[in-house]
Amino acid sequence: MTADEEPWVFDGWGGVIRMLAEGGHLCLSAAENRAYIRCPEFSPMDAEQARQVLLRRHLTHYGPVSLHDMMYFFRWTQRELKTLLSALPAKTLECDGNTYYYMVEPHSLPALPRCVFLAGFDPVMLGYEKKESPFLPPVHLKQVFNNTGIVFPTLLLDGKVAGKWKEDVKCIHLTPFDNLNKTQQAAVQKAAKALWPDKPLRID
């Protein structure tokens, strides 16, 4: 074990397993038991090519996104991102003085469901600079992202985060950030029933 590898043993975010996974040596099996297996042999990409693939996929699935969003997600510099963007057929749009990048025309994507229960650390919350997220009103930022790095499970209603939820042995607890009208409550109950047919939803 090298001096660079030694700190991984005691790292609280995955330890040796994370080091081996990020190094391409271990991966999760597709089985239900969540066992780790050796990764199959593969030929790694050139670092620059790999970055372009990652950025292309990000723009495809998260776009339109701003440079701030991409810097937040990848932890790459603005200069690095601009170089990578220049090699991709990314499209742009202007809104409120900001430039947004994307690969797929937004109008060609399927409509967002009215009500979605998002898991903790959901990619929808992590894919955008949290202070500029199109889904998270700034007033609710600290209710979703706490000071210890936790990202709570949330309710996405009509395209905006509208509350937090948690599950216990008896039911699903929903804490709305604002009062829900009867139509909204009905939509939330319907979505919850589809996910948890054997558990009631309690709106606190």
Q: What are the language-model segments listed below?
A:
Residues 1-125, 129-131, 137-204:
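Long, low-complexity intrinsically disordered regions
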